[in-house]
Design a protein with these regions (language model features):
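Contiguous beta-strand/loop segments that form the cofactor/metal-binding neighborhood of enzyme cores
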Residues: 122-204, 234-244
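A contiguous active-site-proximal alpha/beta segment in oxidoreductase catalytic domains
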Residues: 35-96
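Mid-domain beta-loop-alpha active-site segment that forms a flexible
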Residues: 58-66, 95-133, 149-153, 254-255
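Short polybasic amphipathic segments
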Residues: 187, 204-219
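C-terminal helix-rich "cap/oligomerization" subdomain common to oxidoreductases
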Residues: 4-7, 54, 162, 237-273
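A short helix->loop->beta-strand "cap" motif at the edges of active sites that frequently abuts
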Residues: 24-26, 50-54, 165
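Active-site loop of classical SDR/Rossmann-like NAD(P)-dependent oxidoreductases
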Residues: 223-236
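Beta-loop-alpha module in the N-terminal Rossmann-like domain of NAD(P)-dependent dehydrogenases
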Residues: 1-47
Length: 273
C-alpha cells in the first residue's frame, strides 16, 4: 500500500496535486517551492486539517547538504550560543536551454524568491529558532536575460524573526562558467558566542570538496570537512513520522511557514531592473 507520494511537478501545480494526494489518504512530499500563492496555502492548510495528512517539503539545501546538517548540530549543541543572524548566498548556474520551459514562466515557477529563495528562508528559521518572520525588504531584477522577460535572474531579501533574529539572503543565476560546480553556496550563522561559515559545494581555489564547515568560538578557530561523514537523517525521520504520526523530521508549521514567507517576499519585491 502506498502511504507517501513524492512529487516534483510544475511548481504552480504542486498544491493541487498535494490536495488530491491528501484527500486520497496519503502523505505528500514535494520539492520546493511547495506552492506559489497564498490562496494555495490556505487550501493546503484546510486539507491538512480535514484529512490529518502531511504536506512535507524537500528543502534540499539544508536537508541534503551534509555541512548544513552539521551546522545544525553545532547550533543545537551550543557551539556558538544563540543564533541571532543568518546570511545566505544561493547562486545558481542557469543553462536555460537545458531546463524545462516552465522554469522561466513566472506564473508557473513563482519567481526567484519563491523558488530558490525558499531554501534560504527555511534555513533562517531553522538556525535561529524563529517560528515566523516579517519581510522588511525584498528586490528582484532581470539584468542580462531580456530573451526571458519573465525570469528573475537576481533577488534578495531581508527579514526579522519573531524572536528578534535577523536575516538576509541573495539568490541569483550568475554562476560563472569557470566555477567547478553549479553554485558557490555560502551560509553565515552569527551566534551570541561565535559564528559559523558554510562553504557548501566548493572551497573556491582551494578544494573541490563540498561540505566545508568553519566556525569560531571561545575555544578557538575550527575547520572540518564533513563530506560523506554526516549523512541525511531527515529522510529516515520523515518515514518514521509518517508511520508514527510524529513530527521529528520537520514540523508541518515550519514546512509551510518557510514557503509562505517566500511567497510574501516575492509579492513585496521591488523590481530594480
Amino acid at each position: 500500500e502506498v502511504k507517501l507520494v513524492a512529487a516534483a511537478c510544475i511548481t504552480s501545480e504542486r498544491a493541487d496535486l498535494g490536495v488530491r494526494v491528501m484527500k486520497a489518504g496519503k502523505d505528500y512530499f514535494v520539492a520546493k517551492a511547495p506552492f506559489t500563492t497564498l490562496e494555495q496555502l490556505a487550501l493546503i492548510k484546510q486539507t491538512i486539517q480535514e484529512t490529518g495528512r502531511k504536506y512535507m517539503v524537500h528543502y534540499s539545501e539544508r536537508l541534503q547538504v551534509e555541512s548544513a546538517v552539521y551546522a545544525g548540530e553545532l547550533v543545537k549543541g551550543g557551539a556558538i550560543g544563540k543564533g541571532i543572524q543568518v546570511m545566505g548566498m544561493g547562486p545558481h548556474r542557469l543553462d536555460a536551454p537545458s531546463r524545462p520551459a516552465w522554469l522561466i514562466e513566472k506564473e508557473k515557477y513563482g519567481g526567484i524568491l519563491c523558488d530558490i529563495g525558499s531554501h534560504q528562508i527555511e534555513q533562517f528559521l531553522y538556525y535561529t529558532g524563529a517560528t515566523d518572520a516579517t519581510i522588511t525588504e525584498s528586490k528582484i531584477g532581470n539584468y542580462v536575460h531580456p530573451e526571458y522577460p519573465e525570469l528573475d535572474d537576481f533577488g534578495d531579501a531581508s527579514l526579522i524573526g519573531n524572536n528578534g533574529a535577523t536575516g538576509y539572503f541573495r539568490v541569483d543565476w550568475f554562476t560563472p562558467d569557470g566555477l567547478s560546480t553549479w553554485g558557490d553556496g555560502r551560509m553565515f550563522i552569527l551566534g551570541t558566542d561565535g559564528y559559523i561559515e558554510l562553504r557548501k559545494y566548493v572551497d573556491v581555489a582551494k578544494s573541490d570538496m563540498s561540505d566545508n564547515v568553519y566556525w569560531v568560538n571561545k575555544d578557538g578557530e575550527h575547520y572540518i570537512n564533513v563530506q560523506g561523514k554526516v549523512g541525511f537523517p531527515f529522510f529516515g525521520q520523515l518515514i518514521l513520522d509518517c508511520i508514527n504520526r510524529t513530527e521529528n523530521a520537520m514540523t508541518q508549521e515550519h514546512a509551510l511557514k518557510a514557503a509562505e514567507l517566500c511567497v510574501k517576499a516575492q509579492m513585496l519585491a521591488r523590481k530594480v531592473v
